[in-house]
Amino acid sequence: MWFLILFPALSLGGIDAAPPLQSRVVGGFNCEKNSQPWQVAVYYQKEHICGGVLLDRNWVLTAAHCYVDQYEVWLGKNKLFQEEPSAQHRLVSKSFPHPGFNMSLLMLQTTPPGADFSNDLMLLRLSKPADITDVVKPIALPTKEPKPGSTCLASGWGSITPTRWQKSDDLQCVFITLLPNENCAKVYLQKVTDVMLCAGEMGGGKDTCAGDSGGPLICDGILQGTTSNGPEPCGKPGVPAIYTNLIKFNSWIKDTMMKNA
């Protein structure tokens, strides 16, 4: 499972975690400039570690397995390694991992059969509100269930090579298909639950990977998921990736944001 490559030490505040392999949008393309204004780049000690989604001026949604002891984020970026006048840098004042996510699983070197990675969500409260512009815009939470067969767009920055840590400078996009959860349940030893989504291409070659964790999955124009975990190597035929099913968490997200405004 690829997110464990990135976070066995880093996830709980360690500082010596090795960089991940196989960590990229697979089979994707350069996103059209400023086409994903809700896309967030999450950093730890100046290193890009995860993606995220801007929900409003004060809050970013990402994956719970991206948990570290301090964060900073960039909003409105297209190029990971270049300065962009329109991009905005923010520190994070506090993080709120979903209380139902089992953090202890991140310390394991292998995934035990039946492991449950449900609730892989975390909210980040920005230390200063984002300025809403043409290139920095929030995206709304879903109001209806996603439908299998929908065309989905995932995005993120990550390695463009399979065996060494060479990140893409350009934000990458990839079109994948939302599949019935049974397609994932058949090929994963871990639990596949109703708070997860299964998406990819059964023929392989198009996928998200560890560097994309926490980034958006937009199906038929609606934010429906965030990247959670998937096969290693990424894009493996017959093995779609797993995303968090956001409509199952609307209440928790809204309540957490309201109580910690």
Swiss-Prot record:
Paired cysteines (S-S): C31-C173, C50-C66, C152-C219, C184-C198, C209-C234
Glycosylated residues, chain numbering: N102
Catalytic site positions: H65 (charge relay system), D120 (charge relay system), S213 (charge relay system)
Keyword GTP-binding attached: no
Every Peptidase S1 domain range: 25-258
Catalytic activity: Preferential cleavage of Arg-|-Xaa bonds in small molecule substrates. Highly selective action to release kallidin (lysyl-bradykinin) from kininogen involves hydrolysis of Met-|-Xaa or Leu-|-Xaa
CDD domains: Tryp_SPc (cd00190)
Enzyme class, spelled out: hydrolase
GO molecular function: peptidase activity; serine-type endopeptidase activity
Signal peptide: 1-18
This protein's GO CC annotations: extracellular space
Name of the molecule in the record: Kallikrein 1-related peptidase b26
Organism: Mus musculus (Mouse)
GO-annotated biological processes: brain renin-angiotensin system; zymogen activation
Enzyme nomenclature, EC number: 3.4.21.35
Highest taxon listed in the record's lineage: Eukaryota
Function of the protein: Glandular kallikreins cleave Met-Lys and Arg-Ser bonds in kininogen to release Lys-bradykinin.
Keywords linked to the UniProt accession: Disulfide bond, Glycoprotein, Hydrolase, Protease, Serine protease, Signal, Zymogen
Similarity remark: Belongs to the peptidase S1 family. Kallikrein subfamily.
Pro-peptide region(s): 19-24
InterPro entries documented for this protein: Peptidase_S1_PA, Peptidase_S1_PA_chymotrypsin, Peptidase_S1A, Trypsin_dom, TRYPSIN_HIS, TRYPSIN_SER
